[in-house]
Amino acid sequence: IANFYIISIFNKMNVKMNLPLLPLRDIVVFPSMVIPLFVGRDKSINALNNVMTSDKKILLVTQKNSEIDDPKRTDVFNYGCESRILQLLKLPDGTVKVLVEGVKRAKILDFIEEDKFIKCDYELQKDEVSKDEELMSLSAIAIRRLEKLTSINKKIPSETLNSIKDLKDPSSISDHIASHLNMTISEKQQIFETFNVKKRLDSIIKVMENETSIIGVEKRIRGRVKNQMEKTQREY
């Protein structure tokens, strides 16, 4: 029975599925990430209205160029996130505020133009997981790097750090950390598309080490400039 269950899950990952599409500008949504989105494009609002009458599942995929108003298949990245709508609020100006939760990584296949919105064929993607001990060690290192970064970068709330420290799954830990790091959209998407959890953790650890180093250099420069200014003022 156990083997049958594993095979069933594996096969499901290779089944072509279909959902309405919501193209995103300037944000990458990771699995387990809960985030509010403000939606204004007609096709996107129609897609949301459609899924609210069914199972509330929608496919989120980031645009390569946020300036494009009516994106085609080549205008979005190759991987997105199967997500669920937690809450939807229609605003007075005609736009929509929606609270979404990322669920699973998905490979984007084809766009299907409906009358009022876009649907998308896709396949779910599995994480590539190595030995548990190695992943747990890397997860602990990643959390320590995040603690250090949080102590010098006030843009990351302490509540975020505490919620990540409560996580047990290395894949979820890597995704939650990546979603809060200061990276370009293409850099974030590259980490999103890293299905090997060990490599994903390695990547975010390097990003955090680099960001910590940059912040340290900036602080030292500001300190030297401040000291020089104070010295100049004393001389006058």
Say what each PLM segment does:
Residues 6-236:
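N-terminal low-complexity, acidic/polar interaction/targeting segments
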